[in-house]
Amino acid sequence: MARSVWKGPFVDGYLLKKAEKVRESGRSEVIKMWTRRSTILPQFVGLTFGVYNGSKHIPVSVNEDMVGHKFGEFAPTRTYYGHGADKKAKRK
């Protein structure tokens, strides 16, 4: 079920402060963050965030198409190694 429109998008407060500091400084640094649940806002476009996936920070460069999505959507937490090979085919 989606979030109510009257509540607005959820973003952790400290993330807004960090993004504002980087914008003011003009430096292009990766903003480390642990909040995968935060929504990407239009003011984040052009910034790079290091989204934590449980073991390391994955760099995510925000563009216009990402606005409205959650940060966690762009940093997968599980590694897919593919399905196991068919054991019957190996023996032949």
From Swiss-Prot:
It comes from the Bacteria. Belongs to the universal ribosomal protein uS19 family. Keywords: Ribonucleoprotein, Ribosomal protein, RNA-binding, rRNA-binding. Protein S19 forms a complex with S13 that binds strongly to the 16S ribosomal RNA. The keyword rRNA-binding applies. This is Small ribosomal subunit protein uS19. Gene3D superfamilies: 30s Ribosomal Protein S19, Chain A. The keyword rRNA-binding applies. GO terms for cellular component: cytoplasm; small ribosomal subunit. SUPFAM superfamilies: Ribosomal protein S19. One of its GO terms (biological process) is translation. PROSITE patterns: RIBOSOMAL_S19. InterPro entries: Ribosomal_uS19, Ribosomal_uS19_bac-type, Ribosomal_uS19_CS, Ribosomal_uS19_SF. It comes from Allorhizobium ampelinum (strain ATCC BAA-846 / DSM 112012 / S4). One of its GO terms (molecular function) is structural constituent of ribosome.
